[in-house]
Amino acid sequence: IKLHNIIANISLKALQNDSINAAIKRLSVDEQSGFELRKLSLKVIANNKGMKIENFAIEMPGTEMKMDTIRMEYDSLKALNHFADNVRFSFRTLPSHVTLNDISAFVPALSNFKEKLDLNIDVEGTLNQLNCRTLEINAGDKFRLKGDVSLQDLSRPQDAYVYGHLTNLSANKEGIGFLVRNLSPHYNGVPPVLQHLGNTSFHGEISGYFTDLVMYGLFRTDIGSVQTDLKLSSDKAKALFSYSGGVKTTDFELGQLLGNKQLGKITFNLDVRGNHYKSQYPSITLKGLIASLEYSNYKYENITLD
């Protein structure tokens, strides 16, 4: 780590063996990897039983985040040696927006996300038993995420477990473009198959580890709905993304999705298993029943895949 352009204005009002009263009026710094902290300010009051952080605000090139009072509770100062399990805290964001590219020095995968997101979160618990009672992420009317999330063992990312209930995850046509544009390393426009979905939304649950997530719920689009019960897995060492589970739909407009006028609606209940290795064609296996498929103005029924 190499820091430069450091500007600091720190006020220490009181310091004793078991208490502190201090304020960071301004702290700004640049890091050689590209991270730029334009301003950090806060006031902290702490003793051997707890800590209170007020007026917390942080600014980066595309981020302005403010928080209500951050409160921490612990049995003694020794608890700080085991912060992840023994320090209970709570905080709530005030109106804030973030640009994920601002932290790409630490999370390179976010380097393409250069547009702002409005953020509203309300958190309580310990680092290893965290409950996010409110989670709202919006990009105007284009994209919305609303729900609540519980996280376990965040101090050990490889073992971290997440459970989330999504009451609203939605994107309109412009929102799909927003996501593709900010998540794609090489943006070449929105693929037609995604454009054809129209307005989309997902209501359901996610659970599992960051490398093995189960997604259960209903995915709605302008051309039909799909019920999903899928496990999504990733293996960076093998450059592999895989998925398996069940998908079913009734009268989904397959022809509109693929831009094929010969195809019409499809109804199916299938088990799917797919493997996607980097720089290779995907391998997909389907088993189950296609109850009906319209093709060239004729309906085919009861097609079994095994």
Feature-to-residue mapping (PLM):
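Conserved two-metal-ion catalytic palm core of "right-hand" nucleic acid polymerases
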Residues: 148-149, 232
